[in-house]
Amino acid sequence: MRINPTTSGPAVSTLDEKNLGHIAQIIGPVLDVVFPPGKMPNIYNALVVKGRDTVGQQINVTCEVQQLLGNNRVRAVAMSATDGLTRGMEVIDTGAPLSVPVGGATLGRIFNVLGEPVDNLGPVDTRTTSPIHRSAPAFIQLDTKLSIFETGIKVVDLLAPYRRGGKIGLFGGAGVGKTVLIMELINNIAKAHGGVSVFGGVGERTREGNDLYMEMKESGVINEKNIAESKVALVYGQMNEPPGARMRVGLTALTMAEYFRDVNEQDVLLFIDNIFRFVQAGSEVSALLGRMPSAVGYQPTLSTEMGSLQERITSTKEGSITSIQAVYVPADDLTDPAPATTFAHLDATTVLSRGLAAKGIYPAVDPLDSTSTMLQPGIVGEEHYETAQKVKQTSQRYKELQDIIAILGLDELSEEDRLTVARARKIERFLSQPFFVAEVFTGSPGKYVGLAETVRGFQLILSGELDSLPEQAFYLVGNIDEATAKAMNLEGENK
């Protein structure tokens, strides 16, 4: 009987028995390997190619079986560059899926997709490892408690609050601030949260990965003097990696997070930047595996691949995984199959708008497009819910009036509409906020605003108590008291 690696426990490597095959064909990152009759590896088994290239350099490439082709051939995807591989090279079947180190030994370290440390800080204790392919927790193991996760970011906490143990997506095109927002969330939550975090860098810029590492060392989330006291494990498979690595690095990060949840019974934060690159890597590999492309050229297995990752990110009775994922939106088109498939799995969506970014309003979160299943009076309370709805109504009315203002000017509006526009512009500016991680760029110190303070501030604007203050007083401030103080300063400067 053959064990299915997706449901089996941690398998034991069988390198001693050495089930050997050899390379028959290489197409970019995809290899065809021939094995002796009756010795075919299972799907998802890890294969290792060891040898020397034509100039005598040592080669060590790990691949993952994706398809059984018949005639004793399997098709596998390489997790690192296939440069130097030649036909006829020997391939060893490890007899198990890729396994990565898990547990306390991973904290404060940077890993690649194979679970190998890449931070030059020496080897990692690999006594506890776990396979990256597992089935999702059973339905009866899931936890259904509803509670809010406070982030300290006004626009998020008020209009699209995050669920503790839920899945959150940050949607935006290129350059509207997804990574900065994720770094601010790491700064605010990972520090206040006290639990452990796992960061999966999937197909993003290496520079950003480096910046994040340096920032975490500065803020103490990674403790350089005593690595074991660090609060985060980092797993990177960046833009320069082959598609096999980018396709699996999310699973490596998730496997580490699952261990903290299931074995250590902790509440874990899982950051993934960027989930779109996971889909993109699958799409790159799909055609080479001989699959017919589906909508917009994506892989036909898009929703299955996404589901197998997302369904494992969940809260059980042992502990919770709260996942925050950045989602790149190609050409700002939210109907593209990649972001559209991601939407289905999320509890809250934070949509970033290029229009707001162009106005200089950061975080550029669209108050009308962003949604959350948590924004219900029974969960957040009547006061919060009413305030959020009024803010949305005012913003919506302002959006409707913009065409009239552009053609006829403000003077043609009724008194009531003019007041709505003035308040909406104040709300728009008050939704901006200085970030801790952006202090170097903006020069203004970051602000954390509690939920009660946020609700109070917007209630004051909506009630009309602050109608006399200039709108620039609300731009890039923390709570409402800072806005009134800024207004007094502006008044003093103008005299």
UniProtKB/Swiss-Prot annotation:
Location of the protein in the cell: Plastid, Chloroplast thylakoid membrane
SMART domains, per database record: AAA (SM00382)
Residues where ATP binds: G172, G173, A174, G175, V176, G177, K178, T179
EC number: 7.1.2.2
UniProt KW keywords: ATP synthesis, ATP-binding, CF(1), Chloroplast, Hydrogen ion transport, Ion transport, Membrane, Nucleotide-binding, Plastid, Thylakoid, Translocase, Transport
Presence of the UniProt keyword S-adenosyl-L-methionine in the record: no
One of the protein's GO biological processes: proton motive force-driven mitochondrial ATP synthesis
GO CC annotations, alphabetized: chloroplast thylakoid membrane; mitochondrion; proton-transporting ATP synthase complex
Domain of life: Eukaryota
InterPro entries: AAA+_ATPase, ATP-synt_VA_C, ATP_synth_F1_bsu, ATPase_a/bsu_AS, ATPase_alpha/beta_chains, ATPase_F1/V1/A1_a/bsu_N, ATPase_F1/V1/A1_a/bsu_N_sf, ATPase_F1/V1/A1_a/bsu_nucl-bd
Keyword Nucleotidyltransferase: no
Gene Ontology MF term list: ATP binding; ATP hydrolysis activity; proton-transporting ATP synthase activity, rotational mechanism
Membrane topology: Peripheral membrane protein
Principal localisation: plastid
Catalytic activity, reaction form: ATP + H2O + 4 H(+)(in) = ADP + phosphate + 5 H(+)(out)
Subunit note: F-type ATPases have 2 components, CF(1) - the catalytic core - and CF(0) - the membrane proton channel. CF(1) has five subunits: alpha(3), beta(3), gamma(1), delta(1), epsilon(1). CF(0) has four main subunits: a(1), b(1), b'(1) and c(9-12).
Function summary: Produces ATP from ADP in the presence of a proton gradient across the membrane. The catalytic sites are hosted primarily by the beta subunits.
Cross-referenced NCBIfam families: atpD
Family to which the UniProt record says this protein belongs: Belongs to the ATPase alpha/beta chains family.
PANTHER family: ATP SYNTHASE (PTHR15184), ATP SYNTHASE SUBUNIT BETA, MITOCHONDRIAL (PTHR15184:SF71)
Protein's name according to its UniProt entry: ATP synthase subunit beta, chloroplastic
Species for this entry: Beaucarnea recurvata
Gene transcribed to yield this protein: atpB
